Amino acid sequence: MIHAIKVTITVYVFSMFCYSVWYLLQYYDVAGLRLPDEWIGSLCYLPHGARVLMFCFFRYYSLPGLYLAEITGPSLIHHNDYMDGWSIAAVGSLFSVVAAVELVKWTRATPGFFSFFKEVNFENYKFLYLVIIVSSLLNGLLVNLILSVINTTSAISAVTVFRFAVGDFLGAIAVIATLWVIFRTLIDTRLIIDPRVED
């Protein structure tokens, strides 16, 4: 129980940090893209990186913290950017990551018994990138489908789905690249010890 609470708090804090950084970057238009309002913020959606990393490394323990961040992040940061029904669409966002991880596990299944509880080692980045690609595509479809059903005034469009998929992909890659640079720098300056190096 204590482990689940620690994971939930860790996941929530990291996800909210990603929401905060993402919102500041898109609000101040750091890239200077001067895009139309509906495009702002969705071209590099950092919270998707938090979803993928937290689920890949903390598995199902991360879902409460991720869902809490999905429903409170927009409210605490800037609720006007989100449509009605976002708390339901957040389930679709989380399901896209869970489904992507399970698909990667299924494609790696060895002959014999297949199990949803089979471990996947994400230390090899190619599986992590595969999860990012699949979850970005699924998230673009699922979230837009759910929002179009809930908000009958908005229709689902291929451009919006594509924009969501690209934004989720770029956001997840940005989060992973940033963390990689940070931890690589800490290891190189010997502020942390590389776990792969034996004494």
List each language-model region with its residue ranges:
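Membrane-embedded alpha-helical hairpins and interfacial helices in multi-pass inner-membrane proteins
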Residues: 4-12, 16, 20-53, 78-195
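Generic transmembrane alpha-helix motif of multi-pass integral membrane proteins
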Residues: 46-62, 66
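Short alpha-helix boundary/capping elements
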Residues: 62, 75-76
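Small-polar-interrupted transmembrane alpha-helices in polytopic inner-membrane proteins
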Residues: 66-74
